[in-house]
From Swiss-Prot:
Interacts with KCNQ1; impairs KCNQ1 localization in lipid rafts and only conducts current upon strong and continued depolarization. One of its GO terms (biological process) is negative regulation of potassium ion export across plasma membrane. The lineage of its organism: Eukaryota, Metazoa, Chordata, Craniata, Vertebrata. Highly expressed in heart, skeletal muscle, brain, spinal cord and placenta. This is Potassium voltage-gated channel subfamily E regulatory beta subunit 5. It is linked to AMME complex: An X-linked contiguous gene deletion syndrome characterized by glomerulonephritis, sensorineural hearing loss, intellectual disability, midface hypoplasia and elliptocytosis. Glycans are attached at residues 2, 25. One of its GO terms (molecular function) is transmembrane transporter binding. Potassium channel ancillary subunit that is essential for generation of some native K(+) currents by virtue of formation of heteromeric ion channel complex with voltage-gated potassium (Kv) channel pore-forming alpha subunits. Functions as an inhibitory beta-subunit of the repolarizing cardiac potassium ion channel KCNQ1. Belongs to the potassium channel KCNE family.
Length: 142
């Protein structure tokens, strides 16, 4: 093999290495003696400068997407837990929840409340006119 063919072989291998780096298939081939040859940085033998690959440029977007996903997941879990606690507390005090619902304006007991108020006022008038019976002097107090 003469010297000219070895140069062609070296050029062919350099191009192949560059293509593999751009496609992301060369996992360990990029580690060289220079510290600037990390992930996403490929030496370009034809231009003499480093070219960044598309794989390294999109890494921060992927990390950001995962962080947003987990933030939404945590927020949803917190919201679901808060709602479930409110439901449990509402079940513990059914009388208060029922009273708030029934005594709302225009509720079911509005007509009943008006009728009861009328009968209470009538009963007070009768008691006031007749007077209360006097308690016996010797009655025991409870």
């Amino acid at each position: 093999m003469n010297c000219s063919e070895s140069q062609r072989l070296r050029t062919l291998l350099s191009r192949l290495l560059l293509e593999l780096h751009h496609r992301g298939n060369a996992s360990g081939l990029g580690a060289g003696p220079r510290p600037s040859m990390g992930m996403g940085v490929v030496p370009d033998p034809f231009v003499g400068r480093e070219v960044t690959s598309a794989k390294g440029d999109d890494a921060y977007l992927y990390i950001l997407l995962i962080m947003i996903f987990y933030a939404c997941l945590a927020g949803g879990l917190i919201l679901a837990y808060t709602r479930s606690r409110k439901l449990v507390e509402a079940k513990d005090e059914p009388s208060q929840a029922c009273a708030e619902h029934e005594w709302a304006p225009g509720g079911a007991l509005t007509a009943d409340a008006e009728a009861a108020a009328g009968s209470q006022a009538e009963g007070r008038r009768q008691l006031a006119s007749e007077g209360l019976p006097a308690l016996a002097q010797g009655a025991e107090r409870v």
